[in-house]
């Protein structure tokens, strides 16, 4: 299931190509930050970090996702903004949980935050 998540996010993005084509900066941010950094958070479910460097990488990715969620918020559609704003806020909240868990070196909490993040991403792509 967890490996499936790594593959599903990019596939879901491709399925939303029409919506993202309207917002090229959204697509750029998703491809450059959201996908690679969420994959690092998701990877903890397959292999928990052990070294300082591995934990630092998870923390850095979670922090980049927090910033990315803040950058995404104003980029959404002009109409029907409420769901967009809710999803970007939820993405930021789950990324903050992942960052806190990485700081505490709590792999189970990182996985839980990653699962929450995955659900947020899925919900947004169903919009």
Model-derived segments and spans:
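Bacterial N-terminal signal peptides that target proteins for export
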Residues: 1-11
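A generic structural signal for short, solvent-exposed coil/turn residues
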Residues: 13-15, 33
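Sec/Tat signal peptide C-region and signal peptidase I cleavage site
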Residues: 16-21
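Sequence context surrounding c-type heme c attachment/ligation sites in exported
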Residues: 23-127
């Amino acid at each position: 299931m967890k490996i499936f998540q790594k593959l599903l996010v990019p596939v879901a993005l491709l399925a939303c190509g029409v919506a993202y084509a309207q917002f090229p900066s959204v697509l750029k941010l998703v491809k450059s930050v959201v996908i690679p950094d969420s994959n690092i958070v998701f990877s903890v479910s397959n292999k928990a970090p052990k070294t300082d460097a591995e934990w630092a990488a998870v923390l850095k990715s979670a922090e980049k996702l927090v910033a990315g969620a803040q950058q995404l918020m104003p980029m959404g559609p002009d109409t029907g903004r409420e769901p967009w704003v809710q999803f970007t806020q939820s993405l930021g909240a789950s990324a903050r949980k992942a960052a806190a868990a990485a700081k505490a070196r709590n792999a189970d909490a990182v996985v839980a935050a990653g699962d929450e993040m995955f659900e947020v991403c899925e919900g947004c792509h169903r919009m």
